Amino acid sequence: IPDFRMNVNVSYVQILQGNVERDILDAIQKYSLQTECLCVEMTESGFMDMTPSFCKFRKTLDKNGIPFVIDDFGTGYSNLHCIRDMNPSYVKMDRDFTAKAMNSDRDYELYKNIIPMVHCINVRICAEGIEEKEWLLKMKEMKVDYLQGYYFGRPCGKEQFLQQYASGINVK
């Protein structure tokens, strides 16, 4: 399989319950994974704070070179305090936010101006929900770092994934 990064979702609640970082490190060892090929996304469903459990979790990820991502940025409680306090490797702009930006001048301007603001503190941006070539081109124009969406491929099982991507040639 060519080089790729696999993202794993964890919730803030899982982090607070403790030892999710141990489960991640155990899986890395068990499957002989390279830490730079794994990325941990924190799904966001409520208020998040810098609790001792969260600080331990982040410290473990940093110590082991595992990127940390705030998922669904632009919705709910994921806000600027999350970026400031949690110091993610990158944030994933919510797919609905992306879709609105592609269909509204006002939302486009907001989206476009979030990118340099986040870049200036060395946090990268992933745009979720890229479904059309036109959206891809607009995101490149805005200097979005990573892109994700059905334009590139739909969710699939292991066998289909290996068939599609094992040769490394099915990338748009």
Task: Give the location of each predicted region.
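Helix C-cap/alpha-to-beta connector motif
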Residues: 1-10, 26-37, 64
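EAL-family c-di-GMP phosphodiesterase catalytic domain
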Residues: 11-18, 37-51, 64-172
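Catalytic-core regions built around general acid/base machinery
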Residues: 24-30, 56-64, 113
